[in-house]
Regions:
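A structural signal for short, hydrophobic/glycine-enriched beta-strand patches
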Residues: 21-175
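A transmembrane-helix-recognition feature enriched in membrane-embedded lipid enzymes
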Residues: 171-190
Length: 190
């Protein structure tokens, strides 16, 4: 019976410690468009492209947040980070096209095709930026800010609320996945 409690403690600690890390590193840094400090740069994390080359609904929500930041003057540049191959399309190219249709000039959009995951996106952004606003979905925001800060970026974040857009089932599934991804992120190298 004692071994069961030891295993239970290790499992709970193995989950609680990474979640505490993400919450601690992002404490006070999860903001809204109207109260996030202006940094000049936003990093939009990819979230998939449909087969017809249109951003997924979750990605559209993230891009809409980035557009609002641009329109509010909080950022002058938007880094769109994602996979170069998402259902036959480059995620960053699709993201730029969506932002262009909203009125963001191409010269304000920087493509990062090395963003195959959040860790890679943050690592690449850290090579040129010491502060930025991470734009992702709310369930993904704390881990994203924590990873950006691990790479030396003074990051704040603004999240899109997928549940408010009728994506509750996707949001619930992604939240469960996010716990495991946070555990993984905690153990990744710096």
């Amino acid at each position: 019976m004692r071994a069961v409690w030891v295993v239970f403690g290790v499992v709970v600690g193995g989950i609680a410690l990474p979640l505490g890390w993400a919450w601690g590193r992002s404490f006070g840094r999860v903001r809204r468009v109207d109260d996030v400090p202006a940094t000049g740069v936003a990093l939009v994390l990819g979230a998939g492209v449909r087969w017809d080359g249109v951003p997924s609904r979750i990605l559209q929500g993230r891009l809409d947040v980035a557009f609002e930041l641009f329109r509010a003057g909080k950022v002058r540049r938007i880094i769109v980070s994602g996979s170069p191959e998402s259902r036959g399309h480059s995620e960053p190219v699709v993201m730029r096209r969506y932002l262009r249709a909203r009125g963001v000039p191409d010269e304000a959009v920087v493509l990062d095709e090395s963003g195959v995951d959040t860790y890679s996106s943050c690592r690449t952004a850290a090579q040129e930026h010491d502060s930025l606003i991470v734009v992702t979905t709310r369930f993904h925001l704390r881990r994203s800010i924590a990873l950006a800060r691990r790479h030396g970026i003074d990051a704040h974040g603004v999240g899109h609320d997928a549940a408010a857009d009728g994506l509750r089932r996707v949001n619930a599934r992604a939240t469960r996945r996010e716990v495991l991804a946070t555990v993984k992120a905690f153990w990744l190298p710096r």
